[in-house]
UniProtKB/Swiss-Prot annotation:
GO terms for molecular function: purine nucleosidase activity; uridine nucleosidase activity. Belongs to the IUNH family. RihA subfamily. This is Pyrimidine-specific ribonucleoside hydrolase RihA. CDD domains: nuc_hydro_IU_UC_XIUA. Keywords: Glycosidase, Hydrolase. InterPro entries: I/U_nuclsd_hydro_CS, Inosine/uridine_hydrolase_dom, IUNH, Pyrim_hydro_RihA, Ribo_hydro-like. It comes from Escherichia coli O127:H6 (strain E2348/69 / EPEC). Gene3D superfamilies: Ribonucleoside hydrolase-like. PROSITE patterns: IUNH (PS01247). Hydrolyzes with equal efficiency cytidine or uridine to ribose and cytosine or uracil, respectively. SUPFAM superfamilies: Nucleoside hydrolase.
Amino acid sequence: MALPILLDCDPGHDDAIAIVLALASPELDVKAITSSAGNQTPEKTLRNVLRMLTLLNRTDIPVASGAVKPLMRNLIIADNVHGESGLDGPALPEPAFAPQNCTAVELMAKTLRESEEPVTIVSTGPQTNVALLLNSHPELHSKIARIVIMGGAMGLGNWTPAAEFNIYVDPEAAEIVFQSGIPVVMAGLDVTHKAQIHVEDTERFRAIGNPVSTIVAELLDFFLEYHKDEKWGFVGAPLHDPCTIAWLLKPELFTTVERWVGVETQGKYTQGMTVVDYYYLTGNKPNATVMVDVDRQGFVDLLADRLKFYA
């Protein structure tokens, strides 16, 4: 039986590819998709979810728009990474359907209530919507199997020296998620920076030759340009968000550790930092499965294999 998942995202090139991977995988049953502000403004990330589902002929999936700003802060977006639309590069179709007439939290709660088995929440943007769900519906915590997030890092940040972008945007929300008591799986920069897509991988995807694989290649063409900056020291572009879906499909591709994670919300230099108690110094029980390594070639092969689904 397929694993029921709720996808909360802020597309974003890598979010879009995570959607493509999830919907090409019969092991997963995507019950609903909610959008969050992050990589772009809330209007644009919602539109990008609708555009991607229109491209994939999955207008049957319920979509709802989430919070327009973080819990306690002003919104920061990553338009320098993802462009004016949030999905600059390919020519994507206009949305062929409308979102649900409800909020993201309402759609999430409805989905959890109606599911016969616990649902896995996959969150590839700031954690605002998930935190609002957890705070407003404690009675539904038991309906959540786990929360798989792309965010954080044990080591260096990518938005500040200490913080990864998704967590930095709304650290208070991320702290609510990590301390919720619900199992959390963290795909942080320690693993996503190893899940790099090289130019030859992009050409491999393009050569598959179907409309979706072509769009994915064009998304990566744009995404690779930003990551050519020498400061990163990358060979390709880190494909952050699809690591969450890939872990659900093939956990054997990833090396993980069980550790306690907290989020710094006050620090002068460290706001948004995920503090991973790697050496068990706090005495706190582990609250997260933290990804630390990936079989890069296996990850690329999985993407290439699933892109053939759209032939």
